[in-house]
Amino acid sequence: GLPDEQKYMGMGVSACATCDGFFYRRKVVAVVGGGDTACEEASYLASLASKVYMIVRKPYLRASQIMQERVMQTPNIEILFENTPTGLYGENGLEGVHLTYRAGQEDQREYDLDIDGFFLAIGHHPNSTLFTKWLETDEAGYIKTIGDTPCTAVEGVYAAGDVADPRYRQAIIAAGSGAKAAME
């Protein structure tokens, strides 16, 4: 996390484009990350915001080919490769992000990017390592369930919430999956 991330949470910083994207209709936003989640968030926000910057630390996207093509073909998405966010600024809410281009390189430079919204789309890892000894997980660490049920391969053991949900990662959906597990 960035030093001022919590200070601006709900005042320009968000971790959920589908939850907060409508606040940024016809505004300028940035999405941090280079994977599928970041591309999905950027694509969704592009339908609302006037401009979407994708801030990517690496010189390439880690996202699947189809997601890369989607963001690259969207006219109001601009990808800022080799940029690292170092801080946020603003008086009565978020006004921008401090960036370092090519950190640690000879041509490194720091600059500010004025934005209205800052969306975090990195570091989504399920908190499932405690259970990997007993339960099967996918390559990203999500606990595998049987079909669309919360049942795992271990009888009487259920997985609910974000540890079993690589797609939505929303509190209301996690609560619903908890209810499903309780009913099993």
Residue spans for each PLM region:
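Glycine-rich dinucleotide-binding loop and its adjacent helix/turn
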Residues: G1-L48, T145-I146
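FAD-site-proximal beta/loop scaffold in flavoenzymes
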Residues: Q6-F23, I122-Y168, I173, S177
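Cofactor-binding loop segments of dinucleotide-utilizing enzymes, especially the Rossmann-like FAD-
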Residues: T18, G34, R57-P59, D162
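Phosphate-coordination loops involved in phosphoryl transfer and adenosine-cofactor binding
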Residues: R25-K27, E82, V154
